[in-house]
Amino acid sequence: LVDVGTENSAGDRCAYTMVSKDDYGEVKRMVGRMDGLLRYEHYVPQNLTNYYEYLDYYALSAQMPETYQAAYDFIQPVIDTVNRMDTDSEKVKYLNDYLCSLLTYDKKSVAGIIRTFAPHSEELKGACGDYAHDFKFLCGAAGIPCFTISTTNHAWNMVYADGQWLHVDVAANDLYRQNYILLAKTVSDRTDEAPEATAFLKELLAPGSTK
């Protein structure tokens, strides 16, 4: 741990953990998968340069940013409906269909949680990453363990539903207008590029689920 502050700049004091250049990509990918579990901190000490290289900087709080409160309020009626359902599978299917009703797939567009879960009259387009992050947001609000698997060219989710980890690809389900990958035990046409990170997150979100 390194303290970059001084006696005259107490407000700029911080500590960070450095990783090797070879490990940096893997560690950053892990932190990215934990988005929603660990909040990205936006304050940057004035005397800390290249802060994005120091991974602890991204894992300072387990609280959801206050900027998402409006999104939470927007989806509350949906969450109330989901909470009355009997099984996790029912809940996941409902949330999948709900998100498909809000977004239209376009790999060149960016929607984001705040835009997706807000009143809008125009067609809202998003890429696979938008679907994956939005779906994780919905699952989190519904109390369903969920994380995002991101590869070099695609992103989808895994959810812990009714005692097992299953794949959900809302973007593909919306694009093909069918339940293409919805609560699937395996996926044959997708490769998890960080299986160790996946195993770690499964145990983090649902202890004992991989044993």
Regions found by a protein language model. Name each.
Residues 12, 100-102, 106-109, 121-124, ...:
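Repeated polar recognition positions within modular binding domains
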Residues 58-68, 95, 165, 172-211:
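Intrinsically disordered, low-complexity repeat and linker tracts
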Residues 130-192:
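Hydrophobic/aromatic-rich core segments of domains that either
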Residues 95, 99, 128, 139:
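Conserved hydrophobic/aromatic pocket- or pore-lining residues that grip, position, or stack substrates
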